[in-house]
A protein has these predicted regions:
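Negatively charged, low-complexity tracts enriched in Asp/Glu with abundant Ser/Thr
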Residues: 2-46, 134-137
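A cross-kingdom feature marking charged/low-complexity
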Residues: 42-56, 108-137
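Amphipathic protein-protein interaction modules
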Residues: 77-118
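Contiguous interface-forming segments/domains that mediate binding rather than catalysis
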Residues: 4-7, 23-26, 58, 77-81, ...
């Protein structure tokens, strides 16, 4: 995926969106006890305003992939995906499994059922982005 967005998104809007998503990704890591040191910029990708993928080096020298955007902020160890495109597939599958588990355990909990539907919707979106060859050329 190249660092592009749809034509109607201005460069300034795209830049602001990417900065906001980077901050959101860092906040998510910090809330999970992971402290950011640097970014592996050549492996990061974003498609404003849909999804941003960041490869982060932590203060203790570990690497993580982080996803943000119009999706749940989430992260995983860098070993789980070789690149940003594979990472979209990883999170799409992970969120589908999480949604299935939520549906199975939250029979009468409308909030959990709605969140499961949200995860399913976002995972389908990630699959579509991953499959668009023109984004990855």
């Amino acid at each position: 995926m190249t660092d592009q967005s749809s034509p109607q998104v201005s460069e300034e809007t795209q830049s602001n969106w990417a900065r906001e998503q980077f901050q959101r990704a860092n906040l998510h890591l910090a809330e999970n006890g992971i402290l950011f040191d640097s970014v592996v910029t050549e492996e990061c990708r974003y498609l404003a305003p849909l999804v941003a993928v960041w490869k982060i080096k932590t203060t203790d020298g570990k690497y993580f992939w982080v996803i943000s955007g119009d999706v749940p902020a989430d992260f995983t160890h860098h070993e789980n995906a070789k690149d940003a495109r594979e990472l979209l597939n990883y999170f799409a599958l992970r969120w589908q499994m999480k949604a299935a588990n939520l549906r199975a355990s939250a029979v009468n909990d409308l909030t959990q059922i709605e969140y499961a539907a949200y995860l399913e919707n976002r995972s389908e979106g990630l699959f579509r982005i991953k499959d668009k060859e023109e984004l990855w050329a």
